[in-house]
């Protein structure tokens, strides 16, 4: 799908960053994978990847950019004018502010969006970790951006491993058979919704 959607100088959003308990720091599997994907998009297509993540992840992403051979900027206009470049954008954790930021990012008309291990809320609006605890306050609400871009018809790919990530609602019935804490009443936070990402994917 990316081969058909992405052309030279096209913007591609990569959504990542999952902040974990108890230390309240981001996990790195999604971040590292996203950096390698960003490099692949630049090398294969001449694309302009922008990592969208919680503010907690920005420093790690900026430090990793040189490791994958890319220059990194927080201004997407600069990214689109310079070679071998990528961007990073911190996305809000405040749900009330998320629609406005999502709308602003959407105006840049990305050719595609890829979510890699980014947290998504369940049907009740609660974000969970792997064992069903409420981590809503820790997470960037980039699921709002995902839903906005999907509604706009932007080609999209989601990667996750436990069901609480963006995009996993698409295969919710399958995930509920094999992954604990995902179905209604199974999470440990008391919301009763399970940790499966709501099916708006």
Q: What kind of region is each of these model predictions?
A:
Residues 11-12, 16-33:
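Short, glycine-rich nucleotide/cofactor-binding loops
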Residues 27-33, 112-113, 119-201:
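Conserved mixed alpha/beta catalytic, RNA-binding, or beta-rich assembly cores of soluble enzyme
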Residues 48-56:
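Short internal beta-strands
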Residues 57-63, 166-167:
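Short, charged/polar "capping" segments at the starts of alpha-helices
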């Amino acid at each position: 799908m990316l081969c058909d959607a992405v052309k030279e100088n096209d913007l591609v959003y990569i959504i990542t960053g999952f902040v974990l308990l108890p230390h309240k720091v981001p996990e790195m599997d999604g971040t590292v994978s996203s950096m390698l994907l960003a490099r692949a998009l630049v090398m294969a297509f001449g694309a302009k990847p922008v990592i969208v993540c919680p503010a907690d992840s920005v420093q790690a992403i900026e430090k990793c950019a040189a490791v994958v051979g890319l220059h990194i900027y927080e201004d997407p206009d600069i990214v689109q004018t310079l070679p071998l470049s990528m961007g990073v954008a911190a996305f809000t954790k405040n749900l009330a502010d998320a629609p406005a930021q999502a709308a602003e990012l959407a105006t840049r008309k990305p050719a595609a969006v890829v979510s890699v291990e980014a947290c998504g809320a369940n049907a009740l609006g609660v974000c969970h970790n792997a064992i069903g605890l409420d981590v809503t306050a820790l997470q960037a609400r980039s699921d709002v951006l995902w839903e906005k871009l999907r509604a706009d018809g932007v080609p999209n790919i989601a990667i996750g491993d436990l069901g609480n990530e963006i995009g996993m609602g698409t295969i919710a019935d399958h995930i509920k058979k094999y992954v604990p804490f995902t179905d209604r009443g199974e999470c440990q936070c008391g919301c009763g919704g399970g940790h499966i990402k709501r099916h708006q994917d």
